[in-house]
Design a protein with these regions (language model features):
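N-terminal secretory targeting signals
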Residues: 1-4
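Short, contiguous pre-domain boundary segments
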Residues: 6-16
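Disulfide-stabilized extracellular recognition modules
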Residues: 87-165
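Short, well-ordered surface patches within globular domains
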Residues: 14-76
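Short edge beta-strand segments in beta-sheet-rich domains
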Residues: 76-78, 146
Length: 165
């Protein structure tokens, strides 16, 4: 653990970017988290990945960071977003930060599933482990300052009243 006031070394070299690496990294990280909750594994969905790519490009183009209102179209897609400094995060680090929210997860009825009392502290994680979700597709886009990761899920998770274990 770093000492107070001492920042850990950060690797500033550009991170590898490749669609095959993105797919394998995302599937592995999602399914490892899901395995811990006995949720069935997700399969990659190219249509979801295309939707994610369109939205990631829009976020990068507009330099905004907000959920896509169109993800609510029928069928409603679940969505996880990440934004970080350009080339500072590998794919594993991007998804790892979302999975790390699991440290605040507590079993219960959604949205009462956070040990902090705030569902926003676990919302990415609960979508990742959502047992009814079966498919995922992710994509990234970059602008001069940031990398954006968008993951889409079907069926969507984070449904109020559902019990998570």
């Amino acid at each position: 653990m770093p000492q107070r006031g001492v920042l850990p070394w950060i690797d500033t070299r550009p991170k590898p970017r490749d669609p095959v690496l993105l797919r394998s990294t995302m599937i592995a990280a999602h399914n490892e988290a899901r395995r811990r909750h006995r949720a069935p594994p997700l399969v990659w969905d190219e249509a979801l990945a295309r939707d994610a790519a369109v939205y990631a490009a829009r976020l990068a183009r507009t330099n905004r960071f907000q959920h896509d209102r169109q993800a609510g179209k029928s069928p409603r897609q679940g969505e996880n977003l990440f934004r970080g400094t350009r080339d500072a995060y590998s794919y594993a680090e991007m998804i790892g930060l979302l999975v790390d929210e699991g440290r605040y997860f507590k079993p219960g009825q959604f949205p009462n599933v956070s040990s902090t009392g705030n569902v926003w502290h676990v919302g990415h994680y609960t979508q990742i482990i959502w047992p009814a979700s079966r498919r995922v597709g992710c994509a990234t886009a970059t602008n001069r300052s940031n990398d954006y990761l968008v993951c889409r899920y079907l069926p969507a998770g984070n449904v109020y009243g559902t019990v998570l274990r």
